[in-house]
Regions:
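Long, contiguous, secondary-structure-rich segments that constitute the structural scaffold
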Residues: 1-29, 33-114
Length: 114
């Protein structure tokens, strides 16, 4: 077990418009930020904001924000964002186990809250 599995890091998330990955829960992290957090490409991370959280598969991207990452505009980014911060927001990120969240997972969470 990696020690970083026990640590949360605050990060800035930017919601991007275009991506082929829009149907998958993918987060693009800056390689230096990922290294500082002990996160590697292909890892699954939990991204949480308030009482909302999802799991994302990590890809590294040099042009991602230095202090965080990019989530393609999708059901996943919309679930974490709100009207005041739908393009950029702060969130916690930590290593997670299991697979990335699916569209069905998001729909199930929303329906359970009603």
């Amino acid at each position: 077990m990696r020690l970083t599995r026990l640590i949360k890091f605050e990060t800035r998330i930017v919601v991007a418009r275009v991506s082929e990955e829009i149907r998958k829960a993918t987060i693009y992290l800056n390689p230096e930020f990922a290294k500082r957090c002990g996160i590697k490409e292909g890892d699954v991370v939990a991204v949480s904001r308030g009482n909302r959280g999802l799991r994302f598969r990590v890809k590294l991207l040099e042009t991602a924000p230095e202090d965080g990452g990019i989530i393609p505009n999708s059901i996943f980014s919309n679930f974490l964002a709100d009207f005041e911060s739908f393009k950029s927001f702060r969130a916690d990120i930590e290593l997670s186990e299991g697979d990335e969240s699916t569209e069905e997972d998001v729909i199930r969470i929303i329906m359970q809250r009603k």
